[in-house]
């Protein structure tokens, strides 16, 4: 315990290296998300075009461009590696952690509490899971965190010059957020600050100085917004109506889920600190009058959470911006409990980690040994993965037990509960999942046929992205299914990138005259190869992915 308090910064740096840097290159990329963002940035670098996103030579208007820039720079510096693909997310998470530390220092002027808040943030299961995963959510979370820190500076500004500067920073953060994921970056800060503005009677300041933030956000994003409007006039129409209105509000929204969807996600996401969640939130509400900084954090957590819960389209990644203020609330609550020797919540947290680790280890044993007839996760040759999984979660439980000893004096070590799991998770994934969701393994095993093929087709966008990334070619064709490329494939100059089921036999006969053809098909569980496909010269089936290789004909 004393070691953690005296060497907090060094241990924090060690934790970050162990969790966020060392293991990520050895983990295969997941489809569709990681393969998609890897390939988009690879093509941007190859084209030298940082304005219009293309995905396998097809226009891709689902997101603005700033998030891709992070990934572009990562690949430019670190090359073609899984680490490079994920470094944009890792770097964004690191900057968010720095902002958490800085804001904690501004709030409480206590180095120990600042280190604790940062440690809690980095050890959240949700933050780790998304922060080492190649998606754009860590980037938008960074800019939303920066926006809220900037807003806090507006509250503490002592003169009009400081207020102008703070609101300008707020505008820059919102502008970068807008260029990363769109209008969401403008809506969330407004929703989060409204209760704070009302409580602290700062409506006049918001009205007077708020336009400065708007002007700065507009000036920052305007050059790219005009450039893409000139190059692709339909971008803003598609991006606003389809990617915002339909995704979040309409009955046809993607990823529809019930209003309570985020409750279990939040509980799992804050592990290994779940025991502090109720007390931290209650403390923020109970002390809202005497400690307005706690209400600031509470509003920052609750208002975006309510907004995302009301929206029809939901994904676990959406609530990542709520984790920064939650880590600060938990740090304040835990420090208060420890200082006043009220150890009940800290003990409960230890018990939760102990039970969670034991329960997960038992589940892996039961499923891994095939004791549940209808659930087959691991094959007969994967016993090593089963026991590694047991070891990972046993480590979680044992660490939870250690935090309970001596009246929970070692409660800070809860951050180490998921450490073994994090280091081993890449080696625990069942082979059937690897072969369906991590196409790099399949591509590696079929690289000779794929790399020599004149044409490569697939019926899965995620697999197509993996093929494009691994083969370093953007001319992968879509077969039978269009998926998220439906809009881009509608452009006249992209229609040849899609081959329908009905057209495939005729197209194949002509294509084989020019070279070998590889067709990669993703199958449903226990599905046989489609009988209507022309007979291939070679077939390689690996669980749910199949390669049909057609040799060049004279």
UniProtKB/Swiss-Prot annotation:
Q: Choose one Gene Ontology CC annotation of this protein and give it.
A: plasma membrane
Q: How does it sit in the membrane?
A: Multi-pass membrane protein
Domain of life, per lineage: Bacteria
Which transformation does this protein catalyse, written as a reaction? 4-amino-4-deoxy-alpha-L-arabinopyranosyl di-trans,octa-cis-undecaprenyl phosphate + lipid IVA = lipid IIA + di-trans,octa-cis-undecaprenyl phosphate
Where, subcellularly, is it found? Answer: Cell inner membrane
Q: Which residues cross the membrane?
A: 4-24, 87-107, 115-135, 178-198, 206-226, 262-282, 293-313, 315-335, 351-371, 384-404, 414-434
**Pfam families (UniProt xref):** PMT
Keyword presence, Glycoprotein: no
Key words of the record = Cell inner membrane, Cell membrane, Glycosyltransferase, Lipid A biosynthesis, Lipid biosynthesis, Lipid metabolism, Lipopolysaccharide biosynthesis, Membrane, Transferase, Transmembrane, Transmembrane helix
* Enzyme nomenclature, EC number: 2.4.2.43
Keyword Repeat (UniProt): no
Q: Please list the GO terms describing molecular function.
A: 4-amino-4-deoxy-L-arabinose transferase activity; mannosyltransferase activity
Q: Which family does it belong to?
A: Belongs to the glycosyltransferase 83 family.
This chain belongs to the protein called Undecaprenyl phosphate-alpha-4-amino-4-deoxy-L-arabinose arabinosyl transferase
Q: Name the species this protein comes from.
A: Yersinia pseudotuberculosis serotype O:3 (strain YPIII)
Q: Which gene encodes it?
A: arnT
């Amino acid at each position: 315990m004393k070691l953690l308090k005296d060497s907090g910064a060094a241990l924090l740096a060690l934790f970050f290296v162990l969790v966020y840097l060392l293991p990520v290159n050895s983990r295969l990329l997941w489809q569709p998300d990681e393969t998609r963002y890897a390939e988009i940035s690879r093509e941007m670098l190859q084209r030298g075009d940082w304005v219009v996103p293309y995905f396998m030579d097809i226009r891709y208007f689902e997101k603005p461009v700033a998030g891709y820039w992070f990934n572009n720079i990562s690949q430019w510096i670190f090359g073609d590696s899984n680490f490079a693909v994920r470094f944009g997310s890792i770097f964004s998470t690191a900057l968010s952690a720095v902002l958490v530390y800085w804001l904690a220092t501004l709030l409480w002027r206590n180095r120990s509490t600042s280190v604790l808040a940062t440690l809690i943030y980095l050890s959240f299961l949700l933050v780790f899971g998304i922060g080492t995963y190649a998606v754009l959510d860590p980037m938008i979370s960074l800019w939303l965190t920066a926006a809220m820190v900037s807003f806090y500076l507006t509250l503490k500004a002592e003169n009009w010059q400081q207020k102008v500067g703070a609101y300008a920073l707020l505008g820059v953060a919102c502008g970068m957020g807008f260029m990363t994921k769109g209008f969401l970056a403008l809506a969330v800060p407004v929703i989060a600050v409204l209760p704070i503005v009302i409580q602290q009677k700062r409506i006049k300041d918001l009205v007077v100085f708020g336009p400065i933030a708007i002007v700065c956000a507009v000036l920052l994003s305007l050059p790219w917004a005009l450039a893409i409007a000139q190059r692709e006039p339909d971008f803003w129409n598609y991006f606003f109506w389809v990617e915002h209105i339909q995704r979040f509000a309409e009955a046809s929204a993607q990823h529809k889920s019930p209003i309570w969807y985020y409750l279990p996600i939040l509980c799992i996401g804050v592990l290994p600190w779940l025991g502090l969640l109720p007390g931290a939130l209650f403390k923020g509400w109970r002390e809202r009058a005497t400690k307005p900084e706690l209400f600031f954090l509470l509003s920052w957590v609750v208002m975006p959470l309510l907004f995302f819960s009301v929206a029809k389209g939901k994904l676990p990644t959406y609530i990542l911006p709520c984790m920064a203020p939650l880590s600060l609330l938990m740090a304040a609550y835990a420090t208060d409990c420890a200082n006043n020797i009220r150890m009940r919540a800290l003990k409960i947290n230890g018990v939760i980690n102990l039970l969670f680790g034991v329960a997960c280890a038992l589940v892996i044993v039961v499923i891994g040994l095939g004791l549940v007839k209808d659930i087959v996760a691991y094959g007969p040759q994967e016993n090593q993965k089963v026991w590694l999984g047991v070891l990972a979660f046993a480590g979680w439980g044992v660490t939870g037990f250690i935090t309970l000893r001596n009246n929970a004096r070692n409660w800070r070590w809860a951050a180490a509960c998921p450490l073994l799991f994090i280091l081993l998770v890449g080696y625990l994934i069942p082979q059937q999942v690897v072969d369906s969701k991590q196409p790099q393994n399949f591509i590696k095993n079929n690289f000779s046929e794929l790399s020599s093929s004149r044409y490569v087709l697939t019926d899965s966008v995620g697999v197509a992205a993996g093929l494009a990334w691994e083969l370093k070619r953007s001319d992968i064709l879509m077969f039978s299914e269009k998926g998220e490329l439906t809009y881009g494939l509608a452009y006249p100059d992209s229609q040849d990138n899609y081959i329908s089921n009905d057209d495939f036999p005729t197209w194949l006969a002509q294509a084989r005259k020019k070279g070998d053809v590889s067709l990669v098909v993703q199958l449903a569980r226990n599905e046989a190869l489609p009988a209507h496909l022309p007979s291939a010269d070679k077939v390689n089936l690996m669980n749910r992915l199949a390669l049909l290789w057609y040799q060049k004909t004279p």
